[in-house]
């Protein structure tokens, strides 16, 4: 794709990406992999060099914000070595004259209110923008350069993902300023506009979901037989101050999970301690439903994961 897109064409392409994030659910990267990877591949191709900016704009908009968070968490939790490339740009062409204007028109065209952007503080907003820009460059891979270092890049990029998710989770302690532009439910909302009350519920759910997923990931992978996945899990445990024990339970959980297509159940999490408090998964009779992207793929799934090389990788990320 070369040159700039006319507004009509650009809006149509942007709408597809907005819908992707508005409709995204936890675990879609695995549970609905064929469709999701295909849609992300198209979105990356359409956005080209603007892919990081497009994700950031969707992150700032209340309608698509949570979808972006779920998408990033799914990539972080994935043990497929190629999934991080979904954040990489597909080419060096910037196809939009003014992305923000096109985004605004696209949201309006989808019947979302014009002024629905979250007022995220400058500190975290700048951090997220810089993160996406960096991943746009460093997560992209070329077959011409080879993929001999895919394991090391998986470790580095996944650590970066978990770090930004940690910072996001911490920032959710003070979300009231983020809601400044959103209306109160008592005053009514326009079209599909979200109210302050709705976003408070979304942020509350996000905190619990992230905390539960992190605990599950650490418990499952700290003793993984895969040294690269284990390195990431140990980093995450340190980052989140989660106490772990060195034994074979994590390895056994991982092997058992592969047999059933999931990595662990809440019952395998009993006794995990961390600074996440009430967000720790418990098995005391109150079942916690989890849907993170921590599943193993079916053997017949050989879809692209952001670049052409991914279909060459086996389930544990090695060439197969």
Swiss-Prot record:
Belongs to the phytoreovirus minor outer capsid protein P9 family. Keywords: Capsid protein, Host cytoplasm, Outer capsid protein, Virion. Residues 297-320 are annotated as: Disordered. It comes from Rice gall dwarf virus (RGDV). This is Minor outer capsid protein P9. The keyword Calcium does not apply. It comes from the Viruses. Its main location: virion. It holds the Pfam family Phyto_Pns9_10. It is found in: Virion; Host cytoplasm. One of its GO terms (cellular component) is viral outer capsid. InterPro entries: Phyto_Pns9_10. The keyword Phosphoprotein does not apply.
């Amino acid at each position: 794709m070369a040159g700039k897109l006319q507004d009509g064409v650009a809006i149509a392409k942007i709408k597809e990406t907005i819908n992707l994030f508005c409709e995204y659910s936890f675990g879609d990267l695995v549970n609905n992999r064929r469709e999701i990877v295909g849609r992300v591949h198209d979105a990356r191709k359409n956005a080209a060099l603007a892919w990081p900016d497009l994700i950031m704009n969707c992150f700032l908009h209340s309608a698509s914000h949570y979808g972006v968070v779920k998408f990033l968490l799914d990539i972080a939790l994935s043990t497929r070595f190629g999934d991080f490339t979904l954040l990489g740009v597909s080419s060096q062409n910037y196809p939009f004259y003014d992305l923000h204007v096109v985004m605004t028109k696209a949201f309006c065209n989808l019947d979302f209110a014009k002024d629905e952007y979250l007022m995220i503080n400058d500190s975290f907003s700048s951090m997220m923008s810089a993160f996406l820009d960096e991943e746009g460059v460093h997560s992209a891979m070329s077959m011409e350069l080879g993929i001999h270092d895919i394991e090391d890049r998986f470790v580095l990029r996944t650590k970066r993902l978990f770090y930004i998710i940690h910072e996001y989770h911490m920032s959710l302690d003070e979300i009231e300023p983020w809601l400044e532009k959103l209306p109160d439910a008592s005053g009514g909302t326009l079209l599909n506009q979200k109210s302050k009350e709705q976003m408070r519920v979304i942020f509350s759910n996000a905190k619990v979901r992230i905390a539960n997923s992190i605990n599950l990931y650490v418990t499952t992978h700290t003793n993984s037989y895969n040294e690269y996945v284990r390195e990431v899990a140990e980093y995450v445990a340190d980052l989140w101050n989660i106490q772990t024990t060195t034994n074979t339970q994590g390895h056994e959980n991982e092997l058992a999970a592969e047999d059933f297509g999931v990595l662990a159940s809440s019952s395998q999490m009993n006794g995990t301690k961390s600074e996440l408090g009430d967000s720790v998964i418990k098995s005391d009779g109150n079942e916690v439903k989890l849907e993170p992207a921590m599943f193993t793929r079916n053997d017949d799934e050989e879809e692209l994961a952001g670049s052409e090389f991914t279909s060459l990788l086996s389930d544990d990320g090695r060439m197969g």
